[in-house]
Regions:
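Short acidic, glycine/serine/threonine-rich helix-capping segments at coil-helix boundaries
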Residues: 1-44, 160, 167
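Basic/polar, cationic surfaces and motifs that engage anionic cell-wall
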Residues: 3, 32-36, 50-51, 125-217
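Alpha-helical and His/Cys-centered functional microenvironments
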Residues: 12, 64, 176
């Protein structure tokens, strides 16, 4: 089921601005925004604002060391090592659209926001802590790993035609402030390689979105 929150985020992504408050309430403003987005995209059914049910992409890091383990492959649809290689997770995009944790369908990568959301993760940040300055641990994120994640996002964007925006391509740390879905103190990504302290997640998320657009689209 596509939720009101999904529609609100998609409308904002299509228009590239916060046209609707993402609050999960399907009121007159949301209905009007959906109608305007349908007109802009040339579709007759509101469900067709989503290509094959894909809502968007959430960017993560695994908090893992070098080398993929089964738990990580189960948790994400795609993984990327710090050298820039990309690996398939256990769940396909089609399975993610049909997400059902009770039946073991899809990856559970984001609390209360998995159906149709594709989880991409850099396999890194073992031992990292959100201290000031940052404790980077034994296996920090790299731009090579992030770029692999962004390139895969671009590939998915071309296939499933979702907007590149703060509402549809965002980090785990942006989910709560941007889409209002409560998370458990997630800080991926509030830092990028070379940072010494955490920053606002949306400010940080704008950097890979801009990098994605400039380098991979």
């Amino acid at each position: 089921m596509i939720t009101a929150r999904d529609y609100q985020g998609r409308v904002n992504g299509i228009f590239g601005q916060p046209k609707l408050i993402v609050d999960g309430m399907n009121g007159p403003n949301t209905s009007a925004g959906i109608s305007q987005a349908m007109a802009k995209m040339g579709v007759r059914r509101k469900e067709d604002l989503f290509n094959r049910g894909v809502r968007g992409v959430v960017w993560h890091w695994t908090a893992g060391a070098n080398g993929l383990i089964e738990l990580e492959k189960k948790a994400y649809n795609f993984l990327h090592d710090t050298k820039g290689n990309t690996y398939d997770g256990n769940a396909t995009v089609a399975e993610q659209v049909m997400y059902d944790w009770r039946r073991g369908i899809g990856a559970s990568h984001t609390k209360s926001m998995n159906t149709g959301w594709i989880g991409l993760s850099v396999d890194a940040m073992a031992g990292a802590k959100q201290t000031n300055p940052i404790t980077w641990g034994s296996h920090p994120i790299t731009w090579s790993g992030i770029d692999a994640m962004l390139e895969q996002t671009a590939n998915l964007h071309h296939e499933y035609v979702f907007p590149i925006s703060p509402w549809t391509t965002l980090s785990h740390a942006e989910v709560q402030p941007t889409l209002g879905v409560k998370q458990r103190w997630k800080w991926d990504y509030t830092v990028l390689p070379g940072d010494t302290k955490s920053r606002d997640p949306v400010e940080v998320g704008n950097i890979p979105r801009e990098r994605l657009t400039e380098r991979f689209l």
